[in-house]
Amino acid sequence: MELRNFFERAIRASFRDLALQDEPAATYLADLLTRFVRTENVYPRGVALPRLETVVDMLLDIQAAWREDSPYFRPEHEVTVRRHIGDYTMFMIGVFRERVERMASTGYYISQGKHAYRFVSEHVRVGAGAAAPPYRRLAERFESYAGALDYARRVHFPEGPCHPFLRLALE
């Protein structure tokens, strides 16, 4: 079975079990899991840093992109990084909640994820209108969707950290 289909089935089944009815969000989360199978998508290159590994790194990258005197001046880069902050925090809280609880503040991740998706939602709404991806709902229902990812992990990836996907994501 293709990996994307595997994730889509797991997420849709989890949404059904949890009575979450949002097809665009389910599709987005399946795409997110598929993208984040590759470590370089979890920790992308920044404009000023070789690899963005933490939310703080990502926020610093946004600042670097806005400095006019910097060779990295690219204000449009903020939307890309904010989307990644939303995706990264959703992924980490949904799939690796215990790790976030050990290494960072879950509340901080939730607030940064919501803020990031809200920012992207407003930016996309101005340019794309109603056809925009579900960033606003991702912001508004962040905890519910992260909970759905956690549920999918426990039900559909019962091997925990030994599951091939979970091993790949942390390499």
Could you say what each language-model-derived stretch is?
Residues M1-L170:
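Polar/charged low-complexity regulatory segments
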